[in-house]
Amino acid sequence: MKGKRVIAGILLVGILATALAGCKNTNITKKEREKPVITLGSDSYPPYNYLNEDGIPTGIDVELATEAFRRMGYQVDVVQINWEKKKELVESGEIDCIMGCFSMEGRLDDYRWAGPYIASRQVVAVNESSDIYKLSDLEGKNLAVQSTTKPEGIFLNRTDERIPKLGNLISLGHRELIYTFLGKGYVDAVAAHEESIVQYMKDYDASFRILEDPLMVVGIGVAFAKEDDRGICEQMDQTLEEMRQ
């Protein structure tokens, strides 16, 4: 398991090093402002995308996208979207792409993808006093997920023989709500990206325990509409590859 965590870190470190280096110069010139704009849709999902104290989008994905699109000759406008309507928004052209710790697995036929640019573990977390230690211990329990996320599909479809039948699967519209439900004892467990759970615990001084066995290790990418033939996705994919080297 430690090996998989190391791999995820390696994928991220190389890209972030170049992204952060590229973001050191924060002076926006007139030439920069004249660049065409890419509208990137995401919801609040720390540490990947969130608003800082000044209300400005920041996070791993924001820094990465800003640097990648800068290299491609674009400036980025990060907008908060209803995550449940992401596919509709990108297909209508209201946003150009989706980026928010977005898992590629199971969605390869739904979008045109750039990436993966990072690997992430989908995991289950419980309260520290819980008697749940293995995935099989979730049998008959109540579990909360953010709606339309990969964990929701994992527990709905149960194509993995390790996934037990739950008592109830509760899908909530916002990331923060699943942790509130867990903390108050409304559910027995939550499932999400490991980094998101760890970040929530840091931000809110919460104490959850993450199960050792992951639900899945997934590749994270940038999603464009399936019919988007502008070539931006392919250029983005190439740029991300160059940033990894």
Regions found by a protein language model. Give the residues of each.
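Bacterial N-terminal signal peptides that target proteins for export
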Residues: 1-10
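C-terminal motif of bacterial Sec signal peptides marking the signal peptidase cleavage site
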Residues: 19-22
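Extended ligand-binding regions for polar small-molecule ligands
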Residues: 24, 62-71, 129-132, 136-150, ...
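Extracytoplasmic small-molecule ligand-binding "clamshell" domains
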Residues: 30-102, 171
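Periplasmic-binding protein-like
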Residues: 42-44, 119-126, 194, 202-240
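Ligand-binding cleft/hinge of the Venus flytrap
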Residues: 51, 65-74, 150-173, 201-205
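A conserved helix-loop-strand patch within extracytoplasmic ligand-binding domains
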Residues: 74, 82, 115-165, 227-230
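A ligand-binding cleft/hinge motif common to bilobed small-molecule-binding domains
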Residues: 85-88, 101-110, 154-157, 181-217
